[in-house]
């Protein structure tokens, strides 16, 4: 141990000296490259994979550090002397060299904390070859500072750590294509093993080892290391594990450089290390010009058996690589893998097919079909469903459910369903029975044939022919079993099973009779064994093909006893006849008592099997019925839950309060009649207490009890779109970061718009009256075409089409509508009113005269269809007409949110509350203030006040912000017992609000072509507003972003389902004619499906182009010049309101 410690001390001293020498070598730059290579050859050879790879990766390090020859020689001599003094080193070691193999090459990258190395001996002649290669390499690329640093780190390691880590360094480290993009390719390398035999001449034999597959290859593979950079260090650490340095302890004998035979002579030194390996790495390219070859020596002491076999041999491992060979390796591996995977997948496919086949058979055995009481969305309800539902609720006794003899459900629908399921169950079992009995037949057939030939029947050919004929027929029957179970014939499985089993039992019963009659009985004892064999054969065939079908039909098949008794009777009759005939013909062979016992046995077995079948069928029927009832109840619960979820309305806080109070009242009423005061009273009072707490929570959580709860919506996107439609008057600045460039003082961008402007013209009442005188009423009256009431009350009346075809469509439709009201208003006042109303509508894509006319027509139509129009007073009808035609008068094509965000004067006047709706009502009564246009001037002041309030309420109700509030109020009133819109004016008002709102958004309930056109128009307005908002650096309003055009379909579906449908659904509750359900809601659902189809097909939704329409209008004939006298009163009204 002392010598070992001295050796370690020498190593440490040597390391210190080397550190000093390295510093000197860095300062020494005077020696040439040739001197450096010469000194290295004399003293030591150092090659590290670390230094090589670092040079390869770091192209910037082009400065070459020269070596100080004198210091290297001096240090290596000291090292050699210290080793010579050690007694642990044998004399043979003096002839060898020390080889250090290190695991780290990336210390400079801060990846490894320590550099571990192992040390072992090799013959000098091996190192000679390595040094020769190193010389050639160094002539091209001299040693760098990295290599010297690696040498210093390698010799500074503890020898004990080196020895412990020796086993961890293997030949098979990966040097495959160092490309960080693919780590897996680094394991694909090949080793060429060159074995040398101990003989006078050395024989080399190439063995190619493919490491990934452990298969021999016939081609050499090469691996190129290139295209690496500094970012690849981390992956390089995973791919290259070894760096190698050579340490020479003695001078190299130049005479042994090319002497390969010295390898064999030096094998005596391998007793301690067992083998020597020479590894050549080829193909390391640098800048595609330098090719370096490192010959290194390594060993692996893990494989003891392999090392003992080659104890006397020198194994030469060559790693050859190139860029092209890597592809071959991958190809070969892939081919092997593909072949293996193909075979494996084929087996898996076959196995999966069989598994699926038998799984389907098993599934059919446990499945209960319920088609008889299932409902189809496309077909009308099955009448059997109601019958079965009634039977489910009337299951009070077994007598009412089942008829015991024969077993049968009293309800024909349940019996039909039971038979349907029987066929399903039996069909799967027929396949199994067919397969099993076929296998059994193929076993029995040759055995019975051999028995027949060796028995007394061998001389009678017709018996053998009959047997084979019956076996062939029996085989066909069994094959038919499989066919029935596997094809569409399975719906007749029960009937076919009875027929086939009856045929099988009858055939072998007749065979039993024939074979019994032809049996020759000879009392000679020598022939008794043969006769016994013959009887055994008869018994086997009788039980397998005669009695076994009975067992199957009674136990394995869920058959019905009212039919399978026939098979039992056939078996008893034929087999009893057989034994009776044999007993009569050969009484000596079959005594009478034996005949009696056999008949009793057959009869008893059949009776007990039948009783068992009856009991089993009874149990199956009860289980089937219970499962059927349970399934029906589960389906009903599931259906109720779906209906509850789908019908769950968007409720307001006030509705929740009312419902909770109703529930609380119901519980309190139940408590009044409660008898169990100990338990139920406490439970129900606690329940009421919880309800009241929820009421308090609802009352205090919001200042507006008509706010809706969006939590009922499952999809968050629906909430987003609903808020976009019903919250258009809320500023986008609330709670949000203020966009840059927005002026909060007064944004005049919209004020300067052509639609609404305060400084365009300055008109007064005198000028307006002057223009009114210019209206040629008589000429207009002649041009107007009146429309029939039936056409106006048709829901499919298309205003878009009519406006394209008629010259004065606005006057045609609206004058026809006002004429349906019994009034005494002069025609000239009506025409003047209509002229001013038409002129106040702007030429925008959606909110124009066409929309106003459509709403008025749909308002009239809905009132007629609901049956309330004829019950209304004429002044209420007139209110409906004025509200409908003026509900969007003066609409600029921008919504309330735009006015609020732009701080428009109208928004300031109306305090951001229903800006446009207030504006529409204001313009309406500005027109009615004109004596020549006031169609209400003949009413009393009281009626006028009432009508004015109604008109204002109806126009303001078209603000979508109040959409769900109005629906909630109507629902609350409708559910009240005293709801009466004829006697109660408040009920009438809320009802008319519902109708005008339905008319306002009625385009969702019309035909798809018309609905699609209206959607194109409203999109055009939305996007125009969005463009204006972007232009003025305002926040984009919902639905106005052109970049989100792909959301149109989804937004329309949400609008129809969650905004329009609740409105029509509430109206359907007062619709005795069922028009809403059969027409409006049906169209709504159909249009939703169309939008959903467009969304799935990703169809592009075209947007209405006003420019193209204007160009089209120019080509039309010019309108009457008198029509140009219509006055735009918008500016006048705004000016007066502002004053």
UniProtKB/Swiss-Prot annotation:
Pathway: Purine metabolism; 3',5'-cyclic GMP degradation; GMP from 3',5'-cyclic GMP: step 1/1; Purine metabolism; 3',5'-cyclic AMP degradation; AMP from 3',5'-cyclic AMP: step 1/1
Extracellular side stretches: 451-462, 520-536, 586-592
Basic and acidic residues bias (residue ranges): 9-22
GO cellular component: endoplasmic reticulum membrane; plasma membrane
One annotated GO biological process: signal transduction
Subcellular location: Cell membrane; Endoplasmic reticulum membrane
Biased composition (Polar residues): 29-42
Alphabetical list of SMART domains matching this protein: HDc
Annotated region described as Disordered, given as residue ranges: 1-42, 154-177
Disulphide-bonded residues: none
EC nos: 3.1.4.35, 3.1.4.53
Key words, A-Z: cAMP, Cell membrane, cGMP, Endoplasmic reticulum, Glycoprotein, Hydrolase, Membrane, Metal-binding, Transmembrane, Transmembrane helix
Binding site for a nucleoside 3',5'-cyclic phosphate: 847-851, 888, 1000, 1052
InterPro entries reported in the protein's UniProt record: HD/PDEase_dom, PDEase, PDEase_catalytic_dom, PDEase_catalytic_dom_sf, PDEase_CS
Catalyzed reactions per annotation: 3',5'-cyclic GMP + H2O = GMP + H(+); 3',5'-cyclic AMP + H2O = AMP + H(+)
Cofactor needs: a divalent metal cation
Sugar attachment sites: 524
Residues engaged in binding a divalent metal cation 2: 888
Domain PDEase: 775-1098
Ranges in the topological domain labelled Cytoplasmic: 1-429, 484-498, 558-564, 614-1139
Family: Belongs to the cyclic nucleotide phosphodiesterase family.
Role played: Plays a role in signal transduction by regulating the intracellular concentration of cyclic nucleotides cAMP and cGMP. Catalyzes the hydrolysis of both cAMP and cGMP to 5'-AMP and 5'-GMP, respectively. By regulating cAMP levels during the asexual blood stage and, thus PKA activation, required for merozoite invasion of erythrocytes and for the parasite development immediately following invasion.
Name used for this protein in its record: Dual 3',5'-cyclic-AMP and -GMP phosphodiesterase beta
Native species: Plasmodium falciparum (isolate 3D7)
Name of encoding gene: PDEbeta
